[in-house]
């Protein structure tokens, strides 16, 4: 895969340039564009993934299915499809926004900051997973309500963005509706 960049955003969340992804994620990470996607299988189960230990931020924590950064000139939907293929080796369908205006700032225990405008989507996996071990060290298909209970009981075991997204009542209801269709 070619070197990835992040799209930097100004105070009005408008693109203001790009920066190499690993250079962007520091102790003073600038605001940038990202995405988060929750994948469900045909049985309505949610795919939770455990981040590889080689990840710069939040290595080894459980998180929603796939996250990433749209590249300059790429739509968020195109970026989600690209990262699903790269990280999970999976094709998706029915890509649906569930929390389009989510943004957050969080600091990893090692000091790395995430500072993202991060629209959240749900999608349906349509093929068998072929996980990229450089991105994902483990995964599990689980019932959404079971994942929600785990998030409430042990939020420290999950990425902060996953906890924040699921903690938003409207987003949680949309995810629950999505998995039940």
Swiss-Prot record:
EC class name: isomerase
Binding positions for Mg(2+) per the UniProt entry: 87
The reaction(s) this protein catalyses: isopentenyl diphosphate = dimethylallyl diphosphate
Its EC number(s): 5.3.3.2
Disulfide bond positions: none
Cofactor(s) annotated in UniProt: Mg(2+); Mn(2+)
Keyword Phosphoprotein: no
Name of protein: Isopentenyl-diphosphate Delta-isomerase
GN (gene name): idi
């Amino acid at each position: 895969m070619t070197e990835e960049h992040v799209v930097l955003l100004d105070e009005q969340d408008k693109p203001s340039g790009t920066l190499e992804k690993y250079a962007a994620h520091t102790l003073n990470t600038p605001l940038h564009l990202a995405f988060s996607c929750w994948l469900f299988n045909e049985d309505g189960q949610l795919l939770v993934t455990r981040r590889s230990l080689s990840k710069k931020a939040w290595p080894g924590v459980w998180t929603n299915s796939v996250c990433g950064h749209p590249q300059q000139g790429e739509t968020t939907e195109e970026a989600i499809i690209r990262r699903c293929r790269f990280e999970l080796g999976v094709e998706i369908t029915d890509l649906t926004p569930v929390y389009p205006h989510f943004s957050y700032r969080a600091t990893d225990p090692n000091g790395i900051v995430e500072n993202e405008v991060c629209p959240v989507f749900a999608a349906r996996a349509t093929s068998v997973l072929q996980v990229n071990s450089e991105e994902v060290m483990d995964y599990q298909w689980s019932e959404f309500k079971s994942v929600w209970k785990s998030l409430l009981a042990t939020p420290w075991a999950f990425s902060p963005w996953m906890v924040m997204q699921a903690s938003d009542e409207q987003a949680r209801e949309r995810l629950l509706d999505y998995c039940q269709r």
